[in-house]
Design a protein with these regions (language model features):
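Active-site loop-to-helix "anion-binding N-cap" substructures in soluble metabolic enzymes
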Residues: 1-230
């Protein structure tokens, strides 16, 4: 679980080389109200003391649970953005257990993870639904964080490039070049969630493949401008 100190250290590391970065901490199903309160207190203090956001263009986001989004938004200062973990592409309806893009937008929460491997598997989120959600968020001046990644079987079969390219093409189908630049892409190899970790050369090769796919779909400039996270 990400601590306030670990996120602060990540900010230090990336901003030492390049100001124009994005860091998002996914809390998953962690942190109750008191935990959020304690995290926000320490995090706000660290950022204020070192004046990170005054010196950098780094975008910092946290993705709390559905219940944690509003208290996190109220407690976290210094322009830290709150990111939803999942949203539905319909404004409202008979979708038990979901929250809509429009509902979070009403509370000025304008970012959401889309297609995280856990929502793909546990909620049976399809490529078509991911595409619809990305489009409706972009239409409403919101920022989708597209999550992509391959399984251990796909990685061992050397199908990483093919898998992530297909995920990107399906997710951004019908999305213009200008809108594609607003999408954040997060690479999360499913096989590396937990005990295993992806090496720097593996991550770099996948990021290169992501930009190659975007260049083929759009152009080199679009591929350069899209933020890619690991």
């Amino acid at each position: 679980v990400c601590t306030a100190q670990s996120v602060k250290e990540a900010i230090e590391k990336v901003t030492s080389k390049n100001n124009n970065k994005v860091i998002i901490a996914n809390w998953k199903m962690n942190k109750k109200f008191e935990d959020i309160k304690a995290y926000a207190y320490v995090f706000n203090k660290l950022l204020k003391r070192d004046k990170f956001l005054a010196k950098t263009k780094t975008l910092i986001g946290v993705a709390p649970t559905m219940l944690g989004m509003l208290p996190a938004a109220a407690m976290l200062k210094n322009n830290v953005v709150v990111v939803a973990q999942h949203v539905h592409y319909e404004k409202s309806g008979a979708f038990t257990g979901n929250v809509s893009y429009d509902q979070i937008h009403e509370y000025n929460i304008n970012y959401s993870l889309i297609g995280h491997s856990e929502t793909r598997s546990m909620m049976n989120v399809t490529e078509g639904q991911i595409n619809k959600t990305i489009k409706v968020m972009l239409e409403n001046q919101m920022v989708p964080v597209l999550c992509i990644g391959e399984t251990l079987e796909q990685y061992e079969a050397k199908q990483t490039g093919k898998t992530i390219s297909l995920q990107i093409m399906n997710a951004l189908k019908g999305v213009s070049s200008e809108n594609a630049k607003k999408v954040i892409i997060a690479y999360e190899p499913i096989w590396a969630i937990g005990a295993q970790t992806a090496t720097v050369p593996v991550i770099k090769s996948v990021i290169d493949k992501i930009r190659e796919c975007l260049s083929d779909m759009y152009d080199e400039q679009t591929a350069k401008e899209v933020h890619v996270l690991y």
